[in-house]
Amino acid sequence: MPLAKRIIPCLDIRDGRVVKNVQFHLNTWDAGDPVALAAEYDRQGADEIVFLDINASWEGRSATLDVLSRAAEQVFVPLTIGGGVSAVEHVKAYLRAGADKVSVNTAAVQRPDLIDEIADLFGSSTLVVAIDCKRRPEGGWEVYLHGGRTPTGIDAVAWAEEAARRGAGELLVTSMDADGTRQGYDIALHQALADAVGVPVIASGGAGSPEDILEVLTVGRADAALAASIFHSGRHTVGEVKAFLRERGVLVRS
């Protein structure tokens, strides 16, 4: 029996507030309190919730524990936290504070052995490797670090393969070109990832409608859809998106 597709609201946090950027850097707007929003999305039927401290890696610090611990008291779906995770000690602290999974991005590229260490100590099921990438003019996608500020020259699909091989339980892959545009996911990117790796892929960047989410879960073959603007704006609820998918034959949890 196929696994249910997951709908995952993403809360980008800066200075204790949920914000939303466009293509990682333009037109930031304040979407509210992270704990209140997480609790609301839990009520709406979210399968999981992701907290990303979007400036943590650039500022050389780890993500806030306060938001996580408060959310864990009020939210009853799995929580993932990321942003500035660069050591096993960070992972241990987040799991103790209530996280179910920890997302690692920049530090994993800089020191790939970190993936092996986390997977060995805590299990692959706790580890999400996040990949931010941008289309190359010559084809393919390039990995960027530090919240999209630093190009690496690394091919995103090749890095996804290595991360999965080293022990990532899931991959959270964001198209920087599509991020915040509400113009749809980069379907070709997610098709390429589905062909390349055997671990679940969470698609991120570009959701503007239930149709966009349907497309990335079916045509793009993603295992889960991460979305922010579509929910923060109030245009759609998680429940509405799930009902839309269910009516079109996509298996989702109630």
Curated annotation (Swiss-Prot):
GO process annotations (BP): L-histidine biosynthetic process
Location in the cell: Cytoplasm
Pathway(s) this gene product operates in, as recorded in its UniProt entry: Amino-acid biosynthesis; L-histidine biosynthesis; L-histidine from 5-phospho-alpha-D-ribose 1-diphosphate: step 5/9
EC code(s) of this entry: 4.3.2.10
Keyword set includes Nucleus: no
PANTHER family per UniProt: IMIDAZOLE GLYCEROL PHOSPHATE SYNTHASE HISHF, IMIDAZOLE GLYCEROL PHOSPHATE SYNTHASE SUBUNIT HISF/H IGP SYNTHASE SUBUNIT HISF/H
Entry's family note: Belongs to the HisA/HisF family.
Protein name (database record): Imidazole glycerol phosphate synthase subunit HisF
Organism field: Symbiobacterium thermophilum (strain DSM 24528 / JCM 14929 / IAM 14863 / T)
